[in-house]
């Protein structure tokens, strides 16, 4: 009994003096309450003070980044990553089921029978919004596009609404699967995965792109036909020139026959007969007449 009465108070006073001289470095103090769910399991019940109380927060609002006067806020990548990891520990589907989180509305009594807690779908939606915001802020190209045109931020936050609609779907989430990959890996069969791929391809088809492709093909076909016509006309002109030269040379050499006067006359009569008659009887008859004419000319000479 003396040991407990005298030794313990002495040790307690010594511990207090040490603490006053070297106070511990406390970086974060949080008070968590616990609540029972429908199955009787006790879960942490917290309020996310970091989440903005705006109806439609921007990526800068979600991570608490104040906008500079130039409209281009400066980012601290280390602080941004730290805040994102904190969000992941709260809203990641693998962790959020074990945590009950109050909504953005103020809650005065956490022991109320119907506290304003986020549902599983709302926590999942917050996680998607956080992931997309982090992806935009970490990627310099996406950040520039968002700062200048406000494009790329397709997930507008709407608490207590239907968060499973198509308006909340997005791609390229950071640190977790995107919605497209989630659908792919959770498809029942290969047919389902292939159909989802075809649907994404159809969604990416732009009517103006199709019109441009058709116009480009038409221009290519017309250009090819025009080049073929030009080539054919040039070939015909060259062939006509060569053929005329050949006929001229043959006329000088009498087409391989003798070059005397009567041989040329005989060739002329024969070509004329060939152009006037086609049957064998007519050609034979005219050949005899032509030979008789040449014989008379030779005799008259």
Curated annotation (Swiss-Prot):
Keywords annotated in UniProt: Chaperone, Membrane, Mitochondrion, Transmembrane, Transmembrane helix
List the InterPro entries hit by this protein, alphabetically.
DjlA_DnaK_co-chaperone, DnaJ_domain, DnaJ_domain_CS, J_dom_sf
Q: Where is the J domain?
A: 58-150
Q: Which GO terms describe its cellular component?
A: mitochondrial inner membrane; mitochondrion
The cellular location(s) given in this protein's UniProt record come to: Mitochondrion membrane
| Membrane topology listed for this record | Single-pass membrane protein
Give the function comment from the record.
Answer: Probable chaperone.
| PANTHER family referenced in this protein's UniProt entry, alphabetically | CO-CHAPERONE PROTEIN DJLA
Record's family?
Belongs to the DnaJ family.
**Designated name of the protein:** J domain-containing protein 1
The scientific name of the source species is: Saccharomyces cerevisiae (strain ATCC 204508 / S288c) (Baker's yeast)
Report which gene this protein is encoded by: JID1
């Amino acid at each position: 009994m003396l040991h407990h009465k005298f030794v313990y108070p002495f040790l307690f006073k010594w511990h207090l003096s040490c603490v006053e001289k070297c106070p511990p470095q406390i970086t974060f103090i949080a008070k968590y309450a616990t609540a029972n769910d429908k199955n009787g399991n006790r879960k942490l019940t917290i309020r996310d003070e970091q989440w903005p109380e705006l109806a439609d927060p921007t990526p800068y609002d979600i991570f608490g980044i104040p906008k500079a006067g130039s409209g281009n806020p400066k980012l601290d990548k280390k602080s941004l990553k730290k805040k994102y990891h904190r969000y992941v520990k709260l809203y990641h589907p693998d962790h959020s089921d074990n945590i009950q989180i109050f909504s953005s509305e103020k809650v005065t009594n956490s022991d109320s029978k119907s506290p304003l807690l986020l549902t599983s779908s709302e926590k999942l939606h917050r996680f998607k919004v956080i992931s997309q915001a982090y992806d935009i802020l970490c990627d310099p190209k996406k950040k520039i596009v968002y700062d200048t045109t406000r494009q790329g931020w397709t997930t507008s936050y709407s608490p207590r609404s239907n968060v499973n609609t198509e308006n909340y779907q997005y791609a390229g989430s950071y640190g977790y699967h995107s919605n497209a990959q989630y659908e792919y890996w959770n498809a029942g069969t290969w047919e389902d995965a292939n159909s989802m791929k075809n649907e994404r391809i159809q969604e990416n088809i732009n009517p103006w792109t199709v019109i441009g492709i058709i116009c480009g093909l038409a221009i290519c076909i017309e250009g090819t036909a025009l080049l073929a016509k030009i080539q054919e006309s040039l070939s015909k002109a060259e062939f006509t020139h060569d053929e005329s030269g050949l006929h001229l040379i043959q006329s000088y050499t009498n087409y391989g026959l003798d070059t005397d006067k009567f041989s040329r006359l005989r060739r002329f009569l024969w070509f004329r007969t060939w152009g006037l008659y086609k049957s064998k009887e007519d050609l034979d008859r005219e050949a005899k007449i032509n030979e008789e004419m040449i014989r008379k000319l030779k005799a008259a000479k």
